[in-house]
Amino acid sequence: MTFLRVVKNKAYFRRFQVKFRRRREGKTDYYARRRLVAQDKNKYDSPKYRLVVRLTNKRVICQIVSSTLVGDKVHASADSSELVHYGVKVGLTNYAAAYCTGLLLARRLLTKLKLDSQFVGKVEADGELYHVEEDDNERRPFKALLDVGIKNVTTGNRVFGALKGACDGGLHVPHSEKRFPGYSVDDENNGTYDAQAHRDRIFGTHVANYMEYLKEEDPEKYKKQFSAYLKLGLDSESLEDMYASAHENIRKNPVLPTKPKRKLKHVREGSKVLTSKGSYVRNVKITKAQRRERVKQKISLLVNES
């Protein structure tokens, strides 16, 4: 096969077609999105739901989304920053927090659809593979497909922690154990799954082990790195109880607490307007008579000076 150099002449630029904006920005993988969004033609107006998981530097975001012609519609959303209300006040980006966020999303969605009592899911997290569709239910469970975006998924990724939490919460998300922590392949290409290793990740045992190691090896670094834990009185022995109680609290009340509405406040002081959020400047529009009077005052002032 010969190498052909691309000649970027006038014809090349006339026929050049740019990619979609979000593809140019590296935000959307349209190859994967097309397969996640496309619905079977014999299902007509039935939406196809996606479990969207996104990881940032400070939080884990989980959403149940369906696509329409006018744009995506979010049916339920959960954020790891909400875990503060359920007892998890630190470590909001680790694997255990991702599991709690997925569990919160599942229980919140099923409560909204009034299916929370019908699809309880797995109450005790033990790391074992669980599919809600295998239970004896009167109706089919809520099904969603995992959407990881442009992230390169690897075994043990936090995305699959959110997936496990959503499945244990009662959602039907097709998956296998091959990407969970504890899955390994030997030299003969035979895979084995250690559910106990996955359970340790769900309850933050890996964080507790590192806390114990750092406390013995480098106490100064331990106090610096886990200062937020120490302020709350948390140590390596209390982490598992914290996450276990968070799972119970999420199941008791997964609904997002509403904030009280702030009273509107609009007070004008000259050209400054004071509101409940702050203040800003808005000049008052003067009338025609006021403008003429101001012109007369300027003329009289100039006459007096001359």
Swiss-Prot record:
Its biological purpose is as follows: Component of the ribosome, a large ribonucleoprotein complex responsible for the synthesis of proteins in the cell. The small ribosomal subunit (SSU) binds messenger RNAs (mRNAs) and translates the encoded message by selecting cognate aminoacyl-transfer RNA (tRNA) molecules. The large subunit (LSU) contains the ribosomal catalytic site termed the peptidyl transferase center (PTC), which catalyzes the formation of peptide bonds, thereby polymerizing the amino acids delivered by tRNAs into a polypeptide chain.
List, alphabetically, the Gene3D superfamilies matched.
3.30.420.100
Question: Mind telling me which HAMAP family this protein's record contains?
Answer: Ribosomal_uL18_A
The Gene Ontology terms for molecular function here are:
5S rRNA binding; structural constituent of ribosome
Its localization reads: Cytoplasm; Nucleus
- Source organism superkingdom: Eukaryota
Query: What is the gene called?
Result: RPL5
Keywords, comma-separated and alphabetical = Cytoplasm, Nucleus, Ribonucleoprotein, Ribosomal protein, RNA-binding, rRNA-binding
Subunit info here reads:
Component of the large ribosomal subunit (LSU).
Question: Into which family does the record put it?
Answer: Belongs to the universal ribosomal protein uL18 family.
How is this protein annotated for GO cellular component? Answer: cytosolic large ribosomal subunit; nucleus
Name a biological process GO annotation: translation
Principal location class: cytoplasm
Looking up PANTHER family in the UniProt record yields: LARGE RIBOSOMAL SUBUNIT PROTEIN UL18, RIBOSOMAL PROTEIN L5-RELATED
Return any one Pfam family short name: Ribosomal_L5e
Name by which UniProt lists this protein: Large ribosomal subunit protein uL18
